[in-house]
Amino acid sequence: EGCSYCWRIEDVGGRSDRVYRSGEYWAQNAREEIAEAGADGNINPRYVEVNFNQACNFKCSYCSPHLSTTWEKEIKEFGAYDIVDGEHNNLDSLSKQRLLPTKLAQNENPYVTAFWKWWPELYRTLEVLRMTGGEPLMDSNTFKVLDYVYKNPNAWLEMSLTSNMVPPKPILMDMFIEKLQRLEEIQIWEDPEKFNPNSGNNWYVAPACKNFATFVSVD
């Protein structure tokens, strides 16, 4: 079903993710291997995005219960939001779309187990790894990945992590900074609006700015 998403877009004349992504550098590096493998071949992807779980301490308006446990908790308590086009963040609708994650302990999640079984082989040719969430700093697998990368250097790997920079426990940010200090190069992308005192996010701006300042000072 995952592939059919791109097929449907292409059938109506759209530009699908697979067409867009196939033009990026990491895909070009695998062209010969893809051609040799053929249509029925099986090769390791060069670009992987992983979401270990939906745990998050925020409920950003543009987000959703299937990507934030805090959002899910609020919707369960108060119900979906009535808007012009219907109900926003309706749990029944998300469930029918099979977007709500299965409630399992980390050590019982078959998808996480499968990821770590595959990881050593995948890592050999991986060029881009994105860790999203939820809030990635709330998941131990994020730190496990960082430890593995440190112990097994990959000069070709570009790794990114999407974080709100204010995990619920300060020690999580401390651990993150400690791991980053061991990496060779760090690049930062941020949205200035999120750190704007006039944005209405005053409760968030102060701790976020503090953590962000520490983050950018990592050498």
Per-region residue spans from a language model:
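Alpha-helical packing segments of well-folded alpha/beta enzyme cores
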Residues: E1-G2, V48, F115-W118, V145
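Flexible mid-to-C-terminal extensions adjoining Fe-S/redox cofactors in radical SAM and related proteins
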Residues: E1-N53, Y62, H66-N89
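Acidic, low-complexity intrinsically disordered regions
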Residues: S22, V112-A114, S199
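Residues in intrinsically disordered, low-complexity segments of regulatory proteins
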Residues: Y25, F115-W118, I188, N202
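A Trp-anchored, charged/polar loop motif used as the substrate-binding/catalytic surface
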Residues: Q28-G41, N107-P120, D174, L180
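Core AdoMet radical
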Residues: P45-A55, H66-P110, Y123-S140, N152-D174, ...
